[in-house]
Design a protein with these regions (language model features):
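Active-site mouth of glycoside hydrolases
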Residues: 57-322, 328-352, 358-439
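Bacterial N-terminal signal peptides that target proteins for export
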Residues: 29-40
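Residue-level micro-sites within transmembrane alpha helices that shape
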Residues: 36, 48, 247-248
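Boundary at the C-terminal end of the N-terminal hydrophobic targeting segment
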Residues: 52-54
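Bacterial N-terminal signal peptides
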Residues: 40-49
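Intrinsically disordered, low-complexity repeat/linker tracts enriched for polar/charged residues
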Residues: 4-28
Length: 441
């Protein structure tokens, strides 16, 4: 549900819904002359179009805290990769569902969403999401662009925040592989078809390919400098954006590329800052797991002035901390490993640290809605309590929100509802649905 109207003397109270209601009441005020009404109306509309105040943006304090409206900001959030698609009026769009999902999230205290700006490349590639945003270098699907505009406008209404990632090391949204295809490296392997080793060998070329990186830099320029077609405001002035993120789980995929990887992340961070001084910049890193096991490289990247805060991801099942047949029995070890992974990274930076991806399977690796989430619930509870009761974490985003979706197939097919699981994953595998009451209550 929407938050109550903010008092007039604190920030800008006139979001679209409240402004409409106010003007409707104002227009029927009979004791006021038309001239006075007109003057006040002009004043109100001017205020409504003021840029966001400086303290509407999330910043970082010298003490290593997020700050929002002059107060420390810690958050519990989720991953909502498909938000821009839902906001579209075209293929895949469902604005009614988007509004319902945002309201549901806000009602359970989730005010921070990590979202994909949009996918890259052509349609009809197995395990790729559809529709994509960037169909060719610098050529955009206007429906998805306007879907992102709509999503940002809806977040502004609800005083929610988004972390928007602009690239992906993995195949499901195009990312590295698509940029390499566009620069003459041949067809990108698909991990589920051709094996992860072949995929990683192929995409390791992105970090050292100047043409591919420049195509991506142009995409950054196009997105960060965009003007929202709904609000009329540049993205750089939207308080709904907490951070621009360089990529989802960026990796160099080859120890020989570590220095080039560092330089690319720093250069991209500086590029974003030159285009948008209002918003934070983050990497989207998994931590040492995404730096070829080199935690010092992770620290060097995140302590750079080009990066405002630090990211890590944790996947107990993917990282073989738990086995499918013994999730409950392996849970204590997963919690111990989680604590150690967080602590080892926390010790190497004074900047805010966000665990922006973590997931845990349902019992017996079930994917059906209604199946038990007992071990997942216990793991989530541990992570949430750690964030709330310690200084180890400044924010968390679980993966991912499935909300009201009813998966139609185990493997996603065009026309199926979007869940927290992208097209390369079993639908329901890591999704938290609205019906998972033991998780969301």
């Amino acid at each position: 549900m929407n938050k109550p109207l903010i008092p007039f003397n604190h920030l800008n109270p006139f979001n679209h819904v409240n402004l409409f209601n106010f003007l409707n009441h104002f227009n029927h005020h009979k004791s006021m002359s038309k001239k006075v009404k007109y003057t006040i109306l002009l004043f109100i509309m001017a205020i409504a179009n003021f840029p966001a105040l400086a303290n509407d943006f999330v910043t970082v304090s010298q003490d290593g805290d997020f700050i929002l409206r002059d107060k420390p900001y810690k958050y519990a959030g989720t991953n909502f990769w498909y938000g821009a698609i839902l906001g579209s009026k075209g293929e895949g769009g469902d604005r009614e569902r988007l509004s319902a999902e945002l309201d549901s999230l806000q009602a359970i205290g989730i005010d921070n969403l990590r979202i994909l700006a949009g996918g890259d490349g052509n349609h009809s590639i197995p395990s790729h999401i559809e529709p994509t945003l960037q169909t060719e270098p610098g050529v955009y699907n206007q429906d998805i662009l306007e879907g992102l505009d709509y999503l940002i406008a809806e977040l502004e209404k609800r005083d929610m925040r988004a972390v928007i990632y602009l690239n992906n090391a993995w195949e499901w949204s195009g990312g590295y592989g698509t940029y390499l295809e566009w620069t003459g490296h041949g067809e990108a392997p698909l991990p589920l078809r051709d094996g992860y080793e072949n995929y990683m060998k192929y995409v390791s070329k992105f970090i050292t390919d100047d043409k591919a990186k420049e195509l991506y830099a142009n995409h950054v320029r196009n997105m960060v400098t965009r003007v929202n077609s709904i609000t009329g405001k540049p993205y750089s002035e939207s308080p709904a954006i907490m951070s621009w993120q360089i990529a989802n789980e960026p990796r160099c995929f080859d120890p020989a590329n570590k220095e080039a990887f560092y330089n690319w992340l720093v250069d991209t961070g500086n590029l974003i800052k030159s285009l948008d001084p209002n918003h934070l910049v983050s990497t989207g890193s998994e931590g040492m797991w995404g730096c070829e096991g080199d935690i010092d490289l992770w620290a060097r990247i995140h302590n750079s002035d080009a990066i405002d805060y630090a990211n890590i991801h944790i996947w107990p099942y993917n990282w073989n901390w738990v086995k499918p047949e013994s999730l409950a029995e392996d849970l204590p070890q997963a919690i111990t490993n989680t604590k150690d992974y967080i602590s080892s990274h926390r010790a190497l930076t004074k900047k805010p640290l966000v665990l922006e991806e973590f997931g845990f399977p349902r019992e017996n690796m079930e994917i059906a809605k209604g199946s038990s989430t007992a071990s997942r619930d216990a793991y989530y509870e541990y992570v949430l309590n750690l964030m709330v009761n310690s200084n180890d974490l400044n924010g968390i985003n679980f993966w991912g929100w499935g909300g009201n979706a009813n998966p139609a197939h185990k493997t996603w097919q065009p026309g199926d509802p979007y869940t927290g699981d992208p097209a390369q994953e079993d639908q329901g595998l890591n999704s938290v649905f609205s019906s998972d009451r033991s998780t969301v209550d």
